[in-house]
């Protein structure tokens, strides 16, 4: 579905688009069925336009993690490296430096709350690092903290570049969904339940229903 400048993809589907190969996809509802299975690229023009080496590829900043988990950021970092990103940086809360720093030696660190999540004082560092990047991924594992929630909201609207929001980051966005859906250059990758809640919170004109099928929901 698309609301103003924001694109929203259901989590299982986005991987078909990213991989662009070995596509097996079936979308069904009462009056529509589409089946495509092929070993050819879904969007060959995207593959042909990709840089031939990392020097011509973009720079990605990954933000996420808390004192109990950095899996989302670590997984995103590994996937970006495999996908051929030109340069990748990861920022974690500084509370995890001693615990997880050795697992991500490339990581940068920003100020955290006493409980180990990103604090509001991390905002300046995150915005500074975002100036370096061509795109930012809010990878998730932010934990549950009101100070982190405030920081995320401020970052989303102070940073005006390409932004991808996924995993538990989506849930932080419910409180400012009305503003989020008019933010340009924004991609949200979430579960159906998350996207449904986001659409409701943003006062979307049409509700998303699981039983309606993918095609009708995308049309909404």
Regions found by a protein language model. Give the residues of each.
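Substrate-binding N-lobe of the ribokinase-like
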Residues: 46-108
């Amino acid at each position: 579905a698309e609301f103003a400048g924001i694109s929203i993809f259901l989590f299982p589907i986005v991987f078909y688009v990213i991989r662009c190969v070995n596509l097996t996809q079936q979308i069904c509802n009462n009056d529509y069925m589409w089946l495509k299975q092929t070993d050819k690229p879904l969007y060959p023009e995207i593959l042909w336009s990709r840089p031939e080496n990392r020097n011509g590829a973009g720079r990605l900043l990954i933000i996420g993690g808390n004192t109990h988990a950095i899996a989302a950021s670590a997984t995103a970092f590994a996937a970006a490296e495999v996908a051929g990103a030109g340069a990748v940086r990861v920022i974690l809360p500084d509370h995890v430096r001693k615990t997880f720093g050795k697992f991500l030696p490339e990581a940068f660190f920003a100020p955290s709350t006493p409980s180990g999540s990103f604090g509001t004082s991390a905002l300046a560092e995150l915005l500074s690092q975002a100036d370096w990047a061509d795109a930012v991924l809010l990878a998730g594992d932010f934990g549950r903290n009101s100070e982190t929630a405030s920081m995320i909201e401020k970052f989303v609207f102070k940073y005006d570049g390409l932004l991808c929001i996924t995993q538990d980051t989506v849930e932080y966005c419910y409180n400012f969904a009305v503003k989020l859906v008019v933010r340009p250059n924004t991609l949200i990758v979430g579960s159906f339940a998350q996207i449904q809640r986001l659409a409701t919170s943003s006062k979307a004109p049409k509700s998303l229903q699981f039983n309606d099928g993918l095609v009708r929901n995308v049309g909404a």
